[in-house]
Amino acid sequence: LREFFLMVFFPAFLYNGCMDKKKLLLIDGSSVAFRAFFALYQQLDRFKNAAGLHTNAIYGFQLMLSHLLERVEPSHILVAFDAGKTTFRTEMYADYKGGRAKTPDEFREQFPFIRELLDHMGIRHYELAQYEADDIIGTLDKLAEQDGFDITIVSGDKDLIQLTDEHTVVEISKKGVAEFEAFTPDYLMEKMGITPTQFIDLKALMGDKSDNIPGVTKIGEKTGIKLLLEHGSLEGI
């Protein structure tokens, strides 16, 4: 599998033809597009073309992308998308992401044009049935590290913070379309007092309301961190 990705996928991700530094930019397209949509939601009626198509997500996504390309200067880039609601996780747990509000039609109608935008920019995008963008990003991150890349991951999903290490920076989108919080192992330790591995354990203890995953009763972030600092790991607890 590793050789397949290195020979077939990574050459296809080549963005600017510069291989002086092997820098891979991995973008959670579904998450970033959703953030872009809501960043400009208050101006929804302003972002509409002559055909009646809303364009706020398209515009916001392009703006985010332009800022990232200028700042990160990647040699390779891939935008990963979710392939649908049915994944191996829903087969394991039927209520996974249950109870979420319906995706706004104004956002849904723009999605094909975001992919078209990427095509026109010469940026590869990818999705895989039964898997989420997170899974693609996590897999490629580890494979790229083995091949000597430095990686920047961009998402609105904090779950991906677990991937940060000496070669991977995880940037979480914040307000607007150009503000990100960059997580490294040192910054995670400074902000939360835990390691990336402990971050995984913390998520297991807390659960995730946004994904409808229950956690341990009465354990929130503060209590979870306290337990991990006392016992080291989930297994230690």
PLM-predicted stretches and their roles:
Residues 19-124, 175:
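Domain-level signal for Mg2+-assisted phosphodiester chemistry and nucleotide/NA-binding surfaces
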Residues 1, 5-6, 10-14:
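Short hydrophobic targeting helices and cationic amphipathic motifs
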Residues 15, 21, 45-48, 98-237:
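Extended two-metal-dependent nuclease catalytic cores across DNA- and RNA-processing enzymes
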